[in-house]
């Protein structure tokens, strides 16, 4: 019967999730948009609060080829008289959110950035994520005391099983895995490393992912490899792009061989980053 409904896999999965939440009588359900917001299946939800973290170039084929167009689509989750928390800081985009929030009579909040919280997720972008989460807690007036907030932030991986966010696999040299898979995430991650770092990179075969190479610092060394997926970007395509933009690069047939060479080329005080796709993680987790 499901086949006759004409629903997508995501729509069916979302409906099942909502039913499950209802049967379990959860206090709060955190529902993440699949694509954009305005036309997403999840936008049927009547929320107590809406959250927009940041605006990147993900899925611009569907959402629009400018940040303003993408922001407009994401602002589609702002509901009438429902508060919204916005992590995005660029003034040009803030104007879009302010305009739509005013039209919907929705209170809008741009969180203050906190740097004094510790978390077991140690990526350079976690301060922003934590600040957004704290603002949501405040807006909902949840009875969570400071002690429990501090404790929860130190146990995110334990409580959620979330891995692959600035995950330190080994030391001397420092081996890091970070599943940065879009231009904005990669830029933040790479800017956190010192010159001369070795970057093992593999990704899916998507135009935006290949374009990511354009923001790669020329002061680093790149080890390109395929990912464990039928949709992997070919190493030849990555290397051709790297050659055009004058990166220092090497090509490999597997993540294992790329990583082995990166290790061989690194001194004990240097960094090795494996990034580009979550599909790489299953290969290197065995090294723990």
Feature annotation, model-predicted:
Residues 20, 38, 93-96, 185-188, ...:
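Phosphate- and divalent-cation-binding pockets in alpha/beta enzyme and binding domains
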Residues 1-45, 63:
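ATP-dependent carboxylate-amine ligase catalytic core
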Residues 35-39, 46-105:
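Conserved catalytic-core segment of NTP-binding enzymes
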Residues 89-109, 174-177, 210-271:
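C-terminal helical cap/extension that packs against the catalytic core
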Residues 76-84, 193-197, 218-221, 268:
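Short, surface-exposed connector motifs at secondary-structure boundaries
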Residues 7, 25-27, 194, 267-270:
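Short, high-confidence coil segments that cap the C-terminus of an alpha-helix
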Residues 277:
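Active-site-proximal loop/hinge segments that shape catalytic or ion-binding/gating pockets
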Residues 23-33, 41-51, 56-59, 69, ...:
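Nucleotide phosphate-binding/pyrophosphate-handling subdomain across enzymes
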């Amino acid at each position: 019967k499901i086949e006759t409904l004409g629903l997508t896999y995501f729509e069916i999965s979302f409906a099942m999730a909502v039913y499950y939440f209802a049967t379990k009588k959860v206090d709060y359900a955190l529902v993440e948009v699949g694509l954009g917001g305005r036309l997403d299946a999840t936008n049927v939800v009547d929320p107590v609060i809406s959250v927009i973290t940041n605006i990147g170039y993900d899925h611009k084929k569907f959402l629009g080829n400018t940040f303003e167009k993408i922001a407009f689509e994401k602002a589609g989750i702002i509901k009438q008289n429902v508060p919204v928390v916005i992590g995005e800081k660029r003034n040009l985009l803030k104007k879009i959110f302010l305009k739509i929030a005013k039209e919907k009579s929705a209170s809008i909040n741009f969180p203050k950035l906190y740097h004094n919280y510790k978390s077991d997720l140690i990526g350079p972008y976690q301060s922003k994520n934590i600040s957004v989460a704290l603002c949501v807690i405040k807006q909902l007036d949840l009875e969570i005391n400071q002690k429990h907030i501090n404790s929860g932030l130190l146990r995110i991986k334990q409580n959620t099983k979330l891995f692959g966010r600035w995950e330190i696999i080994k030391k001397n040299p420092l081996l890091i895995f970070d599943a940065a898979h879009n231009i904005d995430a990669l830029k933040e991650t790479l800017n956190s490393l010192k010159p001369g770092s070795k970057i093992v990179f593999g990704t899916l075969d998507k135009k935006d992912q290949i374009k990511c190479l354009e923001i790669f610092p020329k002061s680093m060394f790149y080890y390109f490899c395929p990912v464990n997926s039928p949709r992997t970007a070919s190493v030849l395509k990555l290397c051709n792009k790297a050659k055009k933009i004058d990166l220092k690069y090497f090509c490999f047939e597997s993540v294992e061989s790329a990583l082995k060479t990166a290790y061989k080329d690194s001194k004990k005080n240097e960094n090795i980053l494996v990034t580009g796709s979550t599909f790489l993680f299953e290969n290197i987790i065995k090294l723990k």
